[in-house]
Amino acid sequence: MVAEISPLLKFVLELGPLMVFFFANSRGEWLASTFPVLTEFGGPIFIATGLFMIATATALTVSWILTRKLPIMPLISGIVVFVFGALTLWLQNDTFIKMKPTIVNTLFGVILLGGLFFGQSLLGYVFNSAFKLTDEGWRKLTLRWGVFFLFLAVLNEVVWRMFTTDTWVAFKVWGTMPITIIFTMAQMPFVMRHSVEPLGKDEK
């Protein structure tokens, strides 16, 4: 039987690689002296990038083993991590890993808003099994998330271009996740208002 991932484990699998990235960047010199093999990656940000790729692959593998499927968003994000992480290490240029959130969020935003342009509320295809909304509800929720992803893309560009690498790493871990959680919670009243009533409720 395929197991369902508990919300806590799902949160750990999503946040774990980011925590590894933050720790490896902040303690890069200690890691390099303790595990000399890591110096093959380069400086702290490159060590963090290498371990981030490994942690991401591990999280995706655990998710697959437990559920025999991979959620589309973590999968796409993981692919971009591997591509841009590899470029970062190969060229020894941290610009690529810094642009990864911009690319991922822009991709999600364009896909969602592009779907609306063609009359498709793509968010509904992803979450329809979790909760049911009216067509109008899916359209508006898709629009909100599409705009939010583009906002995150712009915000990432501002932070990595205007601040230090350490500040960007801290923001990536301690800024982006809380902002996303707050935004998600803020959508709950909207989701409740546009939820489809269970069939048969009005027939009693």
Swiss-Prot record:
Alphabetical keyword list: Cell inner membrane, Cell membrane, Membrane, Transmembrane, Transmembrane helix
Gene Ontology CC annotation, any one: plasma membrane
Top-rank taxon: Bacteria
Transmembrane domains' residue ranges: 3-23, 45-65, 70-90, 107-127, 145-165, 168-188
Record localization: Cell inner membrane
Main location (coarse class): membrane
Membrane topology: Multi-pass membrane protein
Keyword Transmembrane helix tagged: yes
Pfam families recorded: IspA
Keyword Cell membrane assigned: yes
Function, in words: Plays a role in cell envelope biogenesis, maintenance of cell envelope integrity and membrane homeostasis.
Family: Belongs to the YciB family.
HAMAP family per the UniProt record, alphabetical: YciB
The protein's name in its UniProt record: Inner membrane-spanning protein YciB
Provenance organism: Agrobacterium fabrum (strain C58 / ATCC 33970) (Agrobacterium tumefaciens (strain C58))
Lineage start: Bacteria, Pseudomonadati, Pseudomonadota, Alphaproteobacteria, Hyphomicrobiales
Gene: yciB
